[in-house]
Each structure stands twice: as structure tokens, then as C-alpha cells.
Amino acid sequence: MSGNLLPHGDAFPEVAPSAWVAPGAYVVGDVHLGEESSVWYGAVLRGDTEPIRVGARTNIQDGCVVHADPDFPAIIGDDCVVGHKAIVHGCEIESGCLIGMGATILNGAKIGEGSIVAASALVPEGKEFPPRSLIVGIPAKSAKEVSEEQTEDIARGVRTYVERAASHRESLGRNA
């Protein structure tokens, strides 16, 4: 574990021992990071109004923002990939999802298990998608069902980021 872990009020981030937070990333307040999860350079997870929960082996990539509003916690399941510069705001992302680079998911939205939100898609407030949805566009809509090949690609991405986090942790520990 490294990076910037900061309290807010009485809440301090809870980071699993095997999770990794990159230098330059900020994890603030009521945030829980699961085992082997990772938060990459320049990402911000700010749990100052409601909790943020990130499951096991989920990666929050460079430049992402995860935040919540009153009555809208941010929940991200296990084995998710949240691509560079995505915004996850007061919503629920079930396990096994891929959130594409630059996608935005707003308050009260729910992304079903094993779904893909395409790069730059905008999921409006309160919009819900069933499991295995391929979600595209502005505003987002379901285009089709996620294929087995796409599901395997998500799992491969999860494994890759678990390995990369371990590599970065080792390199930084060696060169600190």
C-alpha cells in the first residue's frame, strides 16, 4: 500500500493488505478497497458524503474519479476494470464489469454484472442495465449482450492489472 490515504471527519480509508494505491492517487474518507484491488496514478476516490466500496481485484485506472452524493454511495464489485479517466459517481457497478476510458456513470445508475460500458459513454442518473449489457452512447443505451469472448477479455484485464500492481509495488519498494 502506498499513495495518499486521507481521513475525512471520523472516516479513514480501509485498504486491504494486498491492495495497492499508486503514488499521486488520493483515497479520502469512507473508502474500502478489497484484496488485490488497485488505484492508479492520478485517480481520486473521495468518500466524503457517502461510502465508496471497491471489491477484490478491481482496478481503478489512471485519472479516474470515484465520488458519491448524499443517498448515493459508489459501489464497484469484484473483478472490475475501470478505464482511464472514467467518472463513477454515486452509482453501482456489479462484479465483472468493464468501464471504458472516459465513460461517465451518474447517481443512482446500476450496471449489471458482466457488462461493458463503452469508452466515453454517458450513463444518466437512475438508469439501470441488466447483466451482460454492452452499453454505448450519449445518453447510454444497451446495444447487445456481451459475448463470451468479451467476458474472457475482462477477466484477462483483471489478471493483468493484479500483476501490474504487484510489479509497480515491487519497483517502487526497491527504488524508494
What residues fall within each predicted segment?
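N-terminal first-folded block
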Residues: 8-53, 71
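Glycine-rich hexapeptide-repeat left-handed beta-helix
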Residues: 1-14, 48, 54-56, 62-64, ...
